[in-house]
């Protein structure tokens, strides 16, 4: 047989000349349905691609994508649980099944449908033209627990002739292989099963003995057939029979089984011709071998896929019966008879292979041209997009530059305006300084003559004396139509030294909301004029001098904060800090709204800072301590050194007096004793009950702060600005909240809000001719029947009414406050 193929070389040109016309190759195709089993994995994409390559060129082909969904036996609930399907839930289960099937189609099968519906390039061999077609696609989702049973039932029910399933190359011993074998054994004889795997494509078809046959490559099958016949010539069937009998297992099992595969793969008519000569056999065999060598493995596998060879079903029975004769005992005679009587078939095979090669060459040329055109189109699109991108970037760059230029101009203009304003301000300040330098410096307080002081105080009348101090007496006076307080220093303290002039000049410039304002002075006689404080001193109010009203607790907390803020201002004053030295309740004055202001600042001590840029103060040493005994710093009494912590000690004593309403003598010991056991009852016993209901937590916090301020050593006392003032600010918020809640309580209207006729608050107050105020409606009704005053009963001179806007505004304010 080898000599037959070697000596029968057929010239390719002669083979091409013997090819039939292209019009003979274009046979009309019948409608065909190809079923594809889709699992959703990457193997399904391989199945789709293979099916498109094999059947996608047919016009009347329909792809039916089949997916097997596990049988639904449970239903999900709204709470996230699942329930079994019963007869009562059958309608709900049907709706749920329909929803699941539809979602499966949308999410799993739709992407594969889009792959199938892509446009395919089809070559018309008769006209050498190309056209674009679409593959029709149907989606089918089946519900079953057995994939093989469901697919087999669908194929047999709809008489599907082609079934394509996927399988991995390692799946021979897995469950996937069992499914494939089960499907192949169960489908009808009219259906051809294609198994697409990584190793190739297997065609499974049923023969008369229901055995499975695999075909991975037509070329490999043909080579195996050729090798089985290479032991002798084509006509010498006895030699072939002896070879088969000498080794029946290898030849019968391996080679003879491939013979039906060859015939099925090429799908040619099984016509018998006994008149063919040996030379013709050799030529046809060599031509077939040459065609097999020139075609690629992919082309060899594709021989059985060409629509021109779809007559395999017509000859399946004949091939199956021929394949069944290859048994161990009957090998030699059928094989020899086949090669002897079917030389025409081999000749036909070589012709068809040549035609197939020519068709593949044309297809390859068309593919190359299509790819080249697509590549050129993509290049043109890419160049167009690149050009558009460059243009867009250029426009964006220009716009960005314009925007940056505009921002830069605006920024420069703003800087220019700011520089001009700054220069103008500096010029004005310079002019002011120059003007002030040309004029002799003046003191920043008003100077009063001694005669004005004497006249304002009625020659220092005892009736106008409102206070007495260690440095002088205080009188109430009226200077320039302004009520003020004049403090006249004793003769021993009125020497006008340079130090007094310096202190007077500096203190006249001090302005703080909680420091008594220095209005003026009479330097010749040592008189200082301050603003008048209506409610006197804190000491008088604490001890209720002249039966004055007690101060509520929330006002006391606010006073503590106000005094602390004034002390911080004095200690931070520039150029030299000021220490009060004589801070006590008698020197804290209250105005008509109980706003506290620290007085007697004019006789305080100014100390120099160690460094002009530093906030640390040097101790000031004075040989003779001044101040009130209970408020003097113990360290100052012992060493004569004074510092800002000296005022902190006096401030702590004032807080203790605000809490208890007692004298300062031994007050520290009393509060410490009450605070030792952390007993609220003991603390409440020492508090001033006239101040109202003290809040325990805030009161305990304030008492602890006061005890820290009264420590014997100054270094143990807290810092006024960093430690004391923040605590007092938080307590002030509590006090303000309590004051607001108290003022929000409804109050009784004043008597002048009432109408003399209605005995109720007036809505529209008006003044009548008798001078009294009435409600407009009430007085109008009165004057309709009377011409006398409702109050005096005297005749009314007229009936005119004048609106009392002032009283009306007061009534409206009272109503709003009490809503």
Swiss-Prot record:
Q: Which reaction does it catalyse?
A: L-seryl-[protein] + ATP = O-phospho-L-seryl-[protein] + ADP + H(+); L-threonyl-[protein] + ATP = O-phospho-L-threonyl-[protein] + ADP + H(+); S-ubiquitinyl-[E2 ubiquitin-conjugating enzyme]-L-cysteine + [acceptor protein]-L-lysine = [E2 ubiquitin-conjugating enzyme]-L-cysteine + N(6)-ubiquitinyl-[acceptor protein]-L-lysine
- Protein name stated in the entry: Putative U-box domain-containing protein 53
Where does this protein hold ATP? 466-474, 487
Keywords for the protein's UniProt record, in alphabetical order: ATP-binding, Coiled coil, Kinase, Nucleotide-binding, Serine/threonine-protein kinase, Transferase, Ubl conjugation pathway
Can you tell me which family this protein belongs to?
Answer: Belongs to the protein kinase superfamily. Ser/Thr protein kinase family.
Compositionally biased region (Basic and acidic residues): 278-296
Give the pathway annotation. Protein modification; protein ubiquitination
Coiled-coil spans are: 395-437
**Could you confirm whether the keyword Kinase appears in this record?**
yes
Q: Which SMART domains has this protein been placed in?
A: S_TKc, Ubox
**What is this protein's function per UniProt?**
Functions as an E3 ubiquitin ligase.
Q: Name one Pfam family in it.
A: U-box
Name the residue ranges with Low complexity bias.
223-237
Name the InterPro entries for this protein.
Answer: Kinase-like_dom_sf (IPR011009), Prot_kinase_dom (IPR000719), Protein_kinase_ATP_BS (IPR017441), Rossmann-like_a/b/a_fold (IPR014729), Ser/Thr_kinase_AS (IPR008271), U-box_ubiquitin_ligases (IPR051348), Ubox_domain (IPR003613), Znf_RING/FYVE/PHD (IPR013083)
Residues forming the Protein kinase domain are 460-728
Catalytic positions are: 582
- Ranges for the U-box domain? 748-819
Q: What EC number(s) is this enzyme filed under?
A: 2.3.2.27, 2.7.11.-
The segment annotated Disordered runs over 208-309, 398-433
Lineage of the source organism? Eukaryota, Viridiplantae, Streptophyta, Embryophyta, Tracheophyta
Organism from which the protein derives: Arabidopsis thaliana
Give yes or no: UniProt keyword Zinc-finger.
Answer: no
MF terms per GO, please?
ATP binding; protein serine kinase activity; protein serine/threonine kinase activity; ubiquitin-protein transferase activity
Polar residues composition-biased segments: 238-260, 297-307
């Amino acid at each position: 047989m080898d000599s037959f193929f070697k000596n029968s070389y057929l010239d390719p040109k002669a083979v091409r000349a013997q090819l039939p016309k292209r019009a003979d190759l274009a046979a009309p195709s019948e409608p065909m349905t190809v079923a594809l089993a889709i699992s959703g994995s990457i193997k399904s994409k391989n199945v789709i691609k293979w099916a498109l390559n094999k059947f996608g060129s047919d016009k009347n082909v329909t792809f039916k994508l089949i997916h097997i969904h596990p049988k639904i036996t449970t239903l999900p609930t709204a709470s996230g649980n699942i329930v079994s399907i019963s007869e009562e839930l059958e309608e709900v289960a049907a709706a749920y099944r329909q929803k699941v099937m539809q979602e499966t189609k949308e999410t799993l099968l739709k992407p594969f449908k889009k792959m199938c519906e892509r446009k395919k390039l089809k070559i018309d061999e008769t006209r050498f033209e190309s056209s674009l077609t679409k593959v029709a696609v149907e989606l089918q989702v089946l519900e079953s627990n057995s994939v093989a049973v469901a697919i087999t039932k669908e194929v047999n029910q709809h008489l599907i002739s082609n079934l394509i399933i996927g399988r991995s190359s390692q799946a021979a011993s897995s469950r996937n292989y069992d499914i494939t074998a089960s499907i192949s054994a169960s489908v009808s004889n009219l259906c051809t099963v294609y198994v697409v795997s990584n190793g190739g494509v297997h065609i499974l078809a049923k023969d008369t003995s229901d055995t499975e046959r695999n075909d991975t490559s037509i070329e490999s099958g043909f080579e195996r057939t050729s090798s089985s016949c290479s032991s002798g010539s084509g006509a010498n069937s006895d030699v072939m029979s002896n070879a088969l009998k000498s080794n029946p297992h290898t030849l019968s099992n391996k080679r003879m089984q491939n013979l039906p595969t060859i015939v099925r793969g090429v799908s040619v008519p099984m016509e018998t011709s006994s008149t063919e000569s040996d030379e013709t056999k050799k030529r046809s065999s060599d031509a077939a071998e040459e065609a097999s060598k020139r075609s690629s493995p992919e082309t060899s596998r594709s021989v059985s896929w060409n629509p021109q060879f779809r007559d395999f079903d017509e000859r399946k029975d004949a091939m199956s019966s021929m394949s069944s004769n290859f048994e161990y005992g009957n090998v030699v005679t059928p094989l020899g008879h086949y090669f002897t009587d079917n030389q025409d078939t081999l000749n036909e095979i070589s012709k068809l292979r040549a035609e197939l090669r020519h068709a593949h060459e044309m297809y390859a040329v068309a593919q190359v041209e299509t790819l080249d055109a697509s590549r050129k189109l993509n290049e043109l699109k890419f160049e167009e997009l690149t050009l558009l991108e460059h243009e867009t970037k250029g426009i964006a760059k220009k716009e960005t530059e314009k925007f940056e230029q505009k921002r830069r101009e605006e920024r420069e203009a703003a800087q220019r305006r700011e520089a001009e304003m700054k220069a103008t301000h500096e010029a004005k300040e310079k002019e002011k300084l120059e003007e002030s330098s040309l004029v002799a410096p003046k003191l920043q307080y008003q100077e009063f003559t001694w005669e004005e002081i004497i006249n304002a105080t009625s020659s220092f009348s005892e009736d106008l004396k409102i206070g007495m101090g260690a440095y002088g007496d205080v009188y109430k006076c009226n200077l320039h139509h302004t009520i003020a307080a004049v403090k006249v220093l004793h003769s021993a303290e009125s020497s006008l030294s340079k130090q007094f002039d310096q202190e007077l000049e500096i203190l006249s410039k001090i302005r703080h909301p909680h420091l008594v304002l220095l209005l003026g002075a009479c330097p010749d006689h040592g008189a200082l004029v301050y603003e008048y404080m209506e409610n006197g001193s804190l000491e008088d109010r604490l001890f209720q001098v002249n039966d004055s009203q007690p101060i509520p607790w929330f006002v006391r907390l606010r006073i503590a904060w106000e005094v602390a803020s004034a002390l911080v201002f004095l200690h931070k004053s520039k150029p030299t800090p000021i220490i009060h030295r004589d801070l006590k309740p008698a020197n804290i004055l209250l105005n008509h709204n109980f706003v506290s202001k620290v007085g007697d600042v004019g006789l305080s001590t100014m100390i120099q800072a160690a460094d002009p840029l530093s906030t640390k103060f040097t101790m000031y040493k004075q040989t003779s301590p001044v101040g009130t005994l209970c408020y003097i710093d113990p360290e100052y009494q012992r060493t004569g050194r004074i510092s800002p912590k000296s005022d902190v000690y006096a401030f702590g004593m004032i807080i203790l007096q605000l809490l208890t309403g007692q004298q300062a003598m031994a007050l520290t010991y009393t509060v410490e004793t009450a605070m030792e056991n952390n007993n609220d009852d003991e603390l409440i016993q020492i508090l001033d009950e006239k101040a109202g209901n003290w809040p325990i937590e805030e009161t305990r916090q304030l008492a602890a702060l006061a005890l820290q301020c009264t420590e014997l050593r100054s270094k143990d006392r807290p810092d006024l600005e960093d430690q004391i003032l923040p605590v007092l600010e938080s307590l002030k918020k509590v006090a303000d909240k309590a004051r607001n809640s108290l003022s929000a309580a409804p109050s009784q209207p004043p008597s002048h809000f009432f109408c003399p006729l209605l005995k109720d608050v007036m809505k529209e107050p008006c003044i009548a001719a008798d001078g009294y105020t009435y409600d407009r409606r009430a007085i109008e009704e009165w004057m309709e029947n009377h011409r006398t005053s409702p109050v005096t009963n005297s005749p009314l001179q007229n009936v005119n009414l004048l609106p009392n806007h002032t009283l009306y505004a007061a009534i409206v304010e009272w109503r709003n406050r009490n809503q």
